[in-house]
Amino acid sequence: MAAIFDRYLQAWLDDDWDAAVALWSEDVVHHVPGRHRLAGTFRGKQAFLDHYHQVFEEVGGTIEVVGIHDVLQSEDHAVALVTERAVRGERSLEFNRVVVYHTDGEHITETWSFDFDPYSIDEFWA
């Protein structure tokens, strides 16, 4: 997992979406919690990519990682503790989240995002 996740994290930090997406399996599953309209489970690389495009469109490309506090890795998983920031119209939000990644050894096969304050996320996307 370390090599895959290290490459994924570097692509993410470099804003290199082609490199990041290449590390997703074709049947990757992305879980986004919440009650807002962008929450849900997105199955498949294209659905995951479409979700990211929708998020970026909604915030005018302003979403960014402003801090990576820690990364924990094992053979099959990585867990990242991050702070992100986004602006949507008159609203701005800086939020902490935990993202869990699962791999098959070659690709990221599943992700789960857990926001520290899910109510503020729901309100931001309302």
Residue ranges and their predicted role:
Residues 64-66, 92-99:
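Short, surface-exposed coil-to-beta transition loops
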Residues 8, 20, 28, 44, ...:
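Hydrophobic pocket/interface hotspot
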Residues 74-84:
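A short hydrophobic beta-strand element
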Residues 21-74:
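A solvent-exposed, acidic/Ser-Thr-rich amphipathic alpha-helical stretch
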Residues 1-16, 23:
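Short, aromatic-enriched amphipathic alpha-helices that serve as compact interaction elements
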Residues 24-25, 84-86, 99, 115:
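Short beta-strand segments enriched in hydrophobic/aromatic residues
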Residues 60, 86-94:
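Short, cysteine-centered beta-strand-loop-beta hairpins and adjacent loop/turn segments enriched
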Residues 110-126:
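Low-complexity, intrinsically disordered terminal/linker segments enriched in charged
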